[in-house]
Amino acid sequence: MRLHGEVSFDEDEEEVVMVPAAALSSSPLNGGAVPVTRLVVGYALTKKKVKSFLQPNLLLLARKKGINLVAIDDTRPLAEQGPFDVILHKITSKEWQQVLEDYHEEHPEVTVLDPPNAINHLNNRQSMLAEVSDLNLSSFYGEVCTPRQLVIMRDPSSIPTAVAMAGLTLPLVAKPLVVDGTSKSHELSLAYDEASLSMLDPPLVLQEFVNHGGILFKVYIIGETIQVVRRFSLPDVNTYDLLNNVGVYRFPRVSCAAASADHADLDPHISELPPRPLLEKLGKELRGRLGLRLFNIDMIRELGTKDRYYIIDINYFPGFGKMPGYEHIFTDFLLNLAQSKYKKCLSGG
């Protein structure tokens, strides 16, 4: 199978003439500044990811900045392709992960975005939020925590008893335990009453529902850059809802399918973005703990509070194409990687 999305350009477009990366080993140029070179980025993405991420505005800007995006063919040995400066990937198969790990062992000079073992940490919702719960990020700017949750591996009939023993409060949000890149793994269910809990389908994670004004903050992290957008989310649940609703209500991928809330006429107490210093501290901590540079955080603010936030999901290499100006942020990120690597080589590191 060939991974989709080979990048090509019209022959009559102006060609950018650049010094090959191999020339860097001869002598520093520009008084020690990073010399002009073409950065080769190999990508291994699904057809869906190619379409959403490698948009024309990104391809054009990358070319202008000297970034060469090359599709990786997984029917050929990876060592026979390239050479690459960076490998960008989002393929979930164990076979691909092993290929990538073997390649990186032979070519440690190639930057892999991101390491497969670090990505795997986010493929399980139990381990996903464990790092957040250990952060202890209470500060002047606010408190960051996670909803109380319970993992159910099997036997739906045992769920009501397990929930009662854990002391969780209804309603509960049910999410598949494993995140495998499919739309089904991002579906949500909302269970209103105890009797309906046995209708759920393990393995899953149950989280206490936190009223948040129906607004979700998607915090995109690309390296050290952070950008936040608002999305409409599940509506708040009140006492009337609990008394008059029974059963399980199923939802698609809410934060992805919902329209942007950035320009909606909202109560400022609900729509106000989390403080920038808090997000920067959170981003730095999670980059270090997760070992990732491309991810996003789904965050909500508890209704009626100004500074209590809950992280409800973390996603690797999310839909950056929906983020305003993503092409500038992402190409700058790639160039900064190259600059950091070059400076490290100059210093003998």
Swiss-Prot record:
Induction: By drought and salt stresses.
EC number(s) on file: 2.7.1.134, 2.7.1.159
Cofactor: Mg(2+)
Binding site for ATP: 125, 175, 207-218, 233
Binding site for 1D-myo-inositol 1,3,4-trisphosphate: K48, K90, H186, K218, N315
Catalytic activity: 1D-myo-inositol 3,4,5,6-tetrakisphosphate + ATP = 1D-myo-inositol 1,3,4,5,6-pentakisphosphate + ADP + H(+); 1D-myo-inositol 1,3,4-trisphosphate + ATP = 1D-myo-inositol 1,3,4,5-tetrakisphosphate + ADP + H(+); 1D-myo-inositol 1,3,4-trisphosphate + ATP = 1D-myo-inositol 1,3,4,6-tetrakisphosphate + ADP + H(+)
Record note on disruption phenotype: No visible phenotype under normal growth conditions, but mutant plants show increased sensitivity to salt and drought stresses.
One BP annotation, GO: inositol trisphosphate metabolic process
Cofactor binding remark: Binds 2 magnesium ions per subunit.
Assembly and oligomerization: Monomer.
Protein name: Inositol-tetrakisphosphate 1-kinase 2
Lineage: Eukaryota, Viridiplantae, Streptophyta, Embryophyta, Tracheophyta
Gene: ITPK2
